[in-house]
Swiss-Prot record:
HAMAP family: UPF0145. Belongs to the UPF0145 family. Pfam families: YbjQ_1 (PF01906). It comes from the Bacteria. Gene3D superfamilies: Hypothetical protein apc22750. Chain B. This is UPF0145 protein ETA_21660.
Length: 107
């Protein structure tokens, strides 16, 4: 499966637009508690533990996106948008969402 944030794939011809596909993952409140408890892990202004959790959430969201695209018979997803939103009571959770257009390509 190919992924692109652009509306086209260079060197590939899109033959069919299959529809919009999405994927979401939510990090619970414990990630924020763990993040602040592990503030000592911050090196150079970055938290390895927090970045690891965000990476995992992004991977889950992309896996859902890919699953939906495959179900539509697509070979690629173009125009991908990645968003991060706080949700829940007191904005205690972080949602990672990805969306794009599933497409079929000429072989």
């Amino acid at each position: 499966m190919k992924f692109s944030t652009t509306p086209t794939l260079e060197g590939q011809q899109i033959t069919e637009y299959c529809g919009v596909v999405t994927g979401e993952a939510i990090l619970g409140a414990n990630i924020f508690r763990d993040f602040f408890a592990g503030i000592r892990d911050i090196v150079g202004g970055r938290s390895g533990a927090y970045e690891k959790e965000l990476r995992k959430a992004r991977q889950i969201a992309f896996a859902e996106l890919e699953e939906q695209a495959e179900a539509l018979g697509a070979q690629a997803v173009v125009g991908i948008d990645i968003d991060y939103e706080t949700v829940g009571k007191d904005s205690s959770m972080l949602m990672v969402s990805v969306s794009g257009t599933a497409v079929k390509l000429r072989h």
